Amino acid sequence: MTEIPSSFVLPDPEWIYRVGIGQDSHRFLPDEDPKPCILGGIIFENTPGFEANSDGDVVFHAICNAFSSVTHKGILGGLADELLKTKGITDSVVYLQEAIASLKPTQRVSHLAITIEGKRPKLLPQLPSMRKRIAEVLHIPLDSINITATSGEGLTAMGQGYGVQCFCVLTIMEYCRY
């Protein structure tokens, strides 16, 4: 049996990484509905809002779900519903702030990868504004966030223009001593 040289022995880890995945989707309201379309905290003009109890921001909702997959604390369908019921809060920024607050003091957001599928609205011109808004809410550097967008070539209901879907992968660094 080959002996492992001491130079290959790893030190006790001080940082571990946890990865969360989140998803959300909503159907558009009729075109004449006045509810605004909000994605990543940005209002998209000339596009109807989403069928949702909240503002329907599928980007912030997917991020909330990614936090929940790391922290095991239900934000959407749990805390967000309670905030809506007791205080009338529909702003997804508030839900995302609650998700951030669910982190342990030893945990930090390292990176966020987001992909959005939908035929409308046209996302490309607003991606920089969306990244900036997400960075502000999460209190992380802009270069820790990336967003891609696709129409899905019309293969799904989202790509056919019925709604928008978002997937998110969240990387959390956690300081721990074993």
UniProtKB/Swiss-Prot annotation:
Biological or metabolic pathway of the protein: Isoprenoid biosynthesis; isopentenyl diphosphate biosynthesis via DXP pathway; isopentenyl diphosphate from 1-deoxy-D-xylulose 5-phosphate: step 4/6
GO molecular function (one): 2-C-methyl-D-erythritol 2,4-cyclodiphosphate synthase activity
SUPFAM superfamilies in the record: IpsF-like
Transmembrane domains' residue ranges: none
Gene3D superfamilies per record: 2-C-methyl-D-erythritol 2,4-cyclodiphosphate synthase (3.30.1330.50)
NCBIfam families noted in UniProt: ispF
Record's subunit section: Homotrimer.
Protein name, UniProt field: 2-C-methyl-D-erythritol 2,4-cyclodiphosphate synthase
